[in-house]
Swiss-Prot record:
It comes from Paracidovorax citrulli (strain AAC00-1). It comes from the Bacteria. This is Large ribosomal subunit protein bL20. The keyword RNA-binding applies. Gene3D superfamilies: 6.10.160.10, Ribosomal protein L20. Signal peptide: none annotated. GO terms for molecular function: rRNA binding; structural constituent of ribosome. GO terms for biological process: ribosomal large subunit assembly; translation. Keywords: Ribonucleoprotein, Ribosomal protein, RNA-binding, rRNA-binding. Binds directly to 23S ribosomal RNA and is necessary for the in vitro assembly process of the 50S ribosomal subunit. It is not involved in the protein synthesizing functions of that subunit.
Length: 120
């Protein structure tokens, strides 16, 4: 069986890792052994933070809704309870967007919620 020389595949593998580590500081971006570790760690952070991102955005939306509803006289928990009673099915992302960009629309939703809470 003929001898297999791995120069081509090794170079391709190295190029792939170094391309992924482009923009990293110092030897993390241009020395293969260190770049390989840096790319692995970056991948772990990316995997973890794709999941964390969902939690962080939900927290942000809740904080924005809470702040906007408190300005209009309701806490977040009272507001969400009123939304359920008023059968208004708008998700937190849309409510937070309304609270920031369209205060009049958010205010009208809060008024509907207050009316439903007062009736109950």
């Amino acid at each position: 069986m003929p001898r297999v020389k791995r120069g081509v595949t090794a170079r391709a593998r190295h190029k792939k890792v170094l391309a992924l580590s482009k923009g990293f500081r110092g030897r993390r971006g241009n020395v293969f052994r260190i770049a390989k570790q840096a790319v692995m760690k970056a991948g772990q952070y990316a995997y973890r933070d794709r999941r964390t991102k969902k939690r962080v955005f939900r927290q942000l939306w809740i904080a924005r809704i809470n702040a906007a509803s408190r300005e209009l006289g309701l806490t977040y928990s009272q507001f969400t309870n009123g939304l359920k009673k008023a059968a208004i099915e708008i998700d937190r992302k849309m409510l937070a967007d309304l609270a920031v960009h369209d205060k009049a629309a958010f205010g009208s939703i809060v008024e509907q919620v207050k009316a439903k809470l007062a009736a109950a």
